[in-house]
């Protein structure tokens, strides 16, 4: 490590080694490791009065393209109001030690990640972004104001970023790429490594994801948000009783009339109401809805089937035959790197 520091550091960009060999076993994990590094970065930026400084979250087994820092600096300079941004990523599909079984497994898991975000955007949710801990950046002042990284052993990135994204003006950096390891792992209960390991243990590259009809149901609700703001409390029930059955059942359990009325009372205009509504119906609540509907109304689909349905919903699918999962992932990657414009309007 010391040799690496001697070789990596250069004028204007020193490299520091932080050693914490005695982490408490109960807390030791990726969340605590990420928190230690990001807390130290925030403290250094605070000491030189740079709250707008950038903290980048990365993983030791990932690698980046040479233009990463340049793209980060350019993006944050051009968007002074952005609190943070996700960086475009791809899992390595070839390379030393990556067999066909791992390749087929990671294709499906990455396709699942991209499908979920893009389906949520199709539904109209404003907080739909990738939230991988290995590929995001946040301003130091925002990091501190949101309480810093948590100590979760898995999902720490998702929970932290879904405190930042609702602040508004969250961004995406697609002019570079962070390349992620597809290795199987049993260190965490979910995530890339756990997903690959699960498929390898099952003996087949098969990954089930949420049925696309559940996102169509959400779209029916989210499309009505402006109408909910304009309506009187007495008519809210009529509006949501015209929605799909899975949505009606879920909203009935959540006292939806009272929620909408509270959002309306505390909103000066439609934009304010919309922000309040989606802070309530945040991505955590979306996942709760999806899990509930797949207990009663829908069965999960193999991810390639769901992804194809999403692509075909607007008539933009460019191949005249049934694609492989790898072909679908290539199309999703291409669309995502162009800023989500080529498939989802």
Regions inferred by a protein language model and the residue ranges of each:
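Acidic donor-binding segment of Leloir-type glycosyltransferases
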Residues: 1-26
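Conserved donor NDP-sugar-binding/catalytic core segment of glycosyltransferases
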Residues: 66-106
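Acidic donor-binding loop at a coil-to-helix junction in glycosyltransferase catalytic cores
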Residues: 152-159
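Active-site donor/metal-binding and catalytic loop motifs
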Residues: 173-194
């Amino acid at each position: 490590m010391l040799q690496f520091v001697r070789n990596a550091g250069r004028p204007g960009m020193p490299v520091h080694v932080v050693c914490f060999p005695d982490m408490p076993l109960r807390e030791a994990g990726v969340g605590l490791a990420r928190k230690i590094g990001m807390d130290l970065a925030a403290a250094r930026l605070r000491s030189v009065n740079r709250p707008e400084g950038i903290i980048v979250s990365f993983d030791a087994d990932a690698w980046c393209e040479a233009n990463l820092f340049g793209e980060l600096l350019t993006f944050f300079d051009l968007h002074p109001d952005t609190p943070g941004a996700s960086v475009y990523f791809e899992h390595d599909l070839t390379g030393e030690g990556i067999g066909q079984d791992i390749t087929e497994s990671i294709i499906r898991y990455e396709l699942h990640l991209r499908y979920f975000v893009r389906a949520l955007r199709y539904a109209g949710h404003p907080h739909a972004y990738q939230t991988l801990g290995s590929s995001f950046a946040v301003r130091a002042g925002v990091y501190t104001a949101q309480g810093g990284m948590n100590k979760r052993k898995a999902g720490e990135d998702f929970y932290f970023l879904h405190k930042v994204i609702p602040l508004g003006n969250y961004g995406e950096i697609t002019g570079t790429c962070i390349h992620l390891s597809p290795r199987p792992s049993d260190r965490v209960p979910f995530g890339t490594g756990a997903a690959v390991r699960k498929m390898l243990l099952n003996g087949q590259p098969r990954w089930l994801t949420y049925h696309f009809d559940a996102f169509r149901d959400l779209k029916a609700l989210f499309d009505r948000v402006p109408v909910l703001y304009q309506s009187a409390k007495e008519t809210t029930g009529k509006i949501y009783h015209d929605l799909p059955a899975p949505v009606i059942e879920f909203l009935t359990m959540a006292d939806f009339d009272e929620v909408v009325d509270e959002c309306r009372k505390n909103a000066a205009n439609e934009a304010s109401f919309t922000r309040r509504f989606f802070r309530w119906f945040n991505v955590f609540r979306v996942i709760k809805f999806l899990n509930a509907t797949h207990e009663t109304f829908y069965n999960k689909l193999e991810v390639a089937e769901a992804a194809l349905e999403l692509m075909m919903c607007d008539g933009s699918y460019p191949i005249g035959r049934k694609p492989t999962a790898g072909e679908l992932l290539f199309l999703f990657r291409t669309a995502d790197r162009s800023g989500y414009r080529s498939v989802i309007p």
